[in-house]
UniProtKB/Swiss-Prot annotation:
Protein name: Putative type VI secretion system protein VgrGA
Organism of this sequence: Dickeya dadantii (strain 3937) (Erwinia chrysanthemi (strain 3937))
Region spans: Disordered: 325-344, 449-469
Mutant phenotype after disruption: A double vgrGA-vgrGB deletion inhibits the ability of RhsB to inhibit cell growth.
InterPro entries (alphabetical): Gp5/Vgr_OB, Gp5_Vgr_C, T6SS_RhsGE_Vgr_subset, T6SS_Vgr_RhsGE, T6SS_VgrG/RHS, Vgr_OB-fold_dom_sf
Record function comment: A Vgr protein that is probably part of a type VI secretion system (T6SS). May be required for export of proteins involved in Rhs-mediated cellular contact-dependent growth inhibition (CDI).
Family according to the record: Belongs to the VgrG protein family.
Signal peptide, first to last residue: none
Amino acid sequence: MANSTGLQFTVKVGALPDTTFAVVDFELSEALNQPFALSLNLASSLPGIDFGAVLDQPCELLVWYEGELQRRVSGIVSRFAQGDTGFRRTRYQAEVRPALWRLGLRTNARIFQTQKPDAIIGTLLEEAGITDFAFALRHEHAVREYCVQYRESDLAFINRLAAEEGLFYFHEFEAGKHRVVFADDAGALTKGPELFFNLATQGLSEGAYVRRFRYAEAVSTAEVALKDYSFKTPAYGLLHNKMSSELDHQRETYQHFDYPGRFKQDPSGKAFTGYRLDALRAGAMTGEGESNAAELMPGSSFTLTEHPNPAFNLAWQVVAVTHSGQQPQALEEESGGEPTTLSNSFEVVKGTTTWRAAMPYKPMVDGPQIATVVGPAGEEIYCDEFGRIKLQFPWDRYGASDDQSSCWVRVSQGWAGGQYGLIAIPRIGHEVVVSFLEGDPDQPIVTGRTFHATNPSPYPLPASKTRTSLRTSTHKGAGFNELRFEDQAGQEEVFIHAQKDMNTVVLNNRSTSVNASHTENVGGDQTVVVQHNQTVSVKENQVTEIQGEQTVAVTQNRNTTVNDNESLQVKNNIAIQSQSGDILIATAGGFIAIDKDGNISITGKGLVLNGTRIDLN
């Protein structure tokens, strides 16, 4: 079907014969970081082609010149339509997209942990059945501890992740297949042809050429400053600045500051700042034009020659291009003898400039979420040195509710200071309320806890609605510690329960006032040690009952004063002994004295001795 211009367009779709369709015209739109879009207007002698043989099937467009292949584009048919039928031909229309486009039809919410961005992207591509992809990376990209795809398509997530990491992608084509390539530097691009500048309209006989070229500069951001925060280094200012080196024609005062910068370490902060500056200045120095070079495509460059302005005769990197081709001969009854033509319009930046995409919208979590505390099998409490825990979110279909389900997540406490405050680690199986810093799904933080049907409150409700309780549960055992307050009128109570030991340390004074009765029951031993004096005052009676032995040891003096009577009743023996001193028993009118040498003195008004037998020696 080639005519005087030497151009010819052919197309092959799925398993259909090569002659099934003739190309009437096409438009191919390609750009960095975008799946290409090929719109084909076709003609066929078949009036009823099976849609199943076309839709979602491979499709390849070939551009020929004088029988030599100039360009190929292959993808899958995303839309197919049948139009009017003429005398000999039926019109059809097909939309062709790359396999990458399919990822825009897959929406998901999932968590990636401790992976580099290229590994995350590779996983998504492989899951979509795309195995023909490559990474041409020249810069180091840090492992992402926690990266969430949140309620966005796989394609949107890839675009966002690529933009954050300074990556861009484009397509390469081989016979019957296409490859998506991810790069992070202009040095990875394919060097393209030389194209001479020519204002005249002519064919390809002298080679492809550029027939229009316009260069523009725009005042843009001059400097980027990004700041973030890490709780691991709270006093360190994670602030990074990057100034453009191409500010000869504008002021340097246009600073772009943003917080948070989406980084937690200096190497990432430095790189992200540079990526952001490149993206914001992507339109600072640009070119656009028209040509008839079919080989122009994103991911490649061309060298412009013979332009009247020598400053433009250099390498240019293709950012976007739209090819248009017309082949009227495909409609034999309507062609009118018009020639086959091919032209394009393109957008470029300088070949040494690394183009980067603008930062896309990042999905935000609209409000708090519910999650379950998880950990390794056989454990009840699982945390790290910062008291962080692992979570399983209800929307995460990939997590196994174990210690790999999430990153370590910080927990808000009621009070947090330097080695003081309140701490209660949520335990495995607990339900918690999770908020997200700045709404960022990559930055969860536990801000609350809730009971639910299988984790009820310590006391049944609403029957115990007047109780305020702090009850714990013995770790890997049965039991609890508890501090409880009862506020029911007439039943007010403060209750303390210690499952095992209870220790109280008072560094100064302690006062206890009981207005009614006080009962203490000690099931084992009791020891009271008073370093100084002790005073016990009982205003009424005191009863002491000892069912075993009692031993009283007084290191110095002991004085007992009884203002009324004193009785001592002993069923067996009484022994009173002074080891080195005297013994004196006295009343108001006399006394009996025994000195340490054994001398006994009895002094009084009289002495009465009665007994069955009295021996005096």
